[in-house]
């Protein structure tokens, strides 16, 4: 599996930001996914940053999805920006994903995010939606 997280500039609302998570089956075999892909903020020292996570049934309840090779499933993430100098602000330069645990998976490819050397991804909290078979409504909550 690979994951791409695409920043959604049209979904900016105050300090709230959104990303479209695209989970793609890169194997030669059909697989099933259900629920959500855990997303973690990671810093330049390759450490998972502690960010409060909330799970939301958005845009609806999770359903089993069968992914043939090359096919994708989608989920939305929403996070609240914070000031790097705040003690409760998570600061990182990349994101990881995991389908089996809540942290420490492979790196996601980021599109539209700050350059990694800037360590400019800030998160006070993050909400993760459910995996869906299409992009419809995935970042509309």
Where are these regions (language model features)?
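Low-complexity, acidic Ser/Thr/Pro/Gly-rich terminal tails and inter-domain linkers that flank the onset
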Residues: 1-13, 137
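Extracellular/mature segments of secreted proteins
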Residues: 3-7, 39-41, 89, 97
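Short, solvent-exposed loop/turn segments enriched in Ser/Thr/Gly
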Residues: 14-20, 90
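Asparagine-centered strand-capping/turn motif at beta-strand->loop junctions
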Residues: 21-28
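Short beta-strands and strand-coil junctions in structured, solvent-facing domains, enriched
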Residues: 28-30, 82-85
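Short acidic, flexible loop segments centered on an aromatic residue
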Residues: 33-48
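Intrinsically disordered, low-complexity Pro/Gly/Ser/Thr-rich segments with frequent PxxP/GP/PP motifs
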Residues: 52-82
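Extracellularly exposed regions in secreted/surface proteins, prominently low-complexity, repeat-rich
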Residues: 72-74, 81, 87-141
């Amino acid at each position: 599996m690979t994951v791409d997280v695409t920043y959604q500039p049209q979904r900016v609302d105050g300090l709230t930001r959104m990303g479209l998570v695209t989970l793609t089956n890169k194997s030669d075999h059909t697989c099933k996914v259900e629920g959500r892909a855990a997303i973690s903020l990671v810093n330049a020292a390759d450490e998972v940053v502690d960010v409060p996570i909330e799970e939301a049934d958005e845009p609806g309840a999770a359903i089993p999805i069968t992914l043939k090779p090359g096919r994708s499933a989608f989920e939305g993430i929403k996070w609240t920006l914070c000031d790097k100098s705040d003690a409760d602000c998570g600061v990182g330069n990349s994101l990881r994903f995991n389908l089996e645990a809540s942290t420490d998976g492979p790196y996601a490819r980021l599109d539209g995010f700050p350059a990694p050397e800037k360590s400019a991804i800030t998160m006070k909290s993050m909400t993760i939606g459910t995996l869906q078979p299409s992009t419809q409504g995935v970042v509309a909550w």
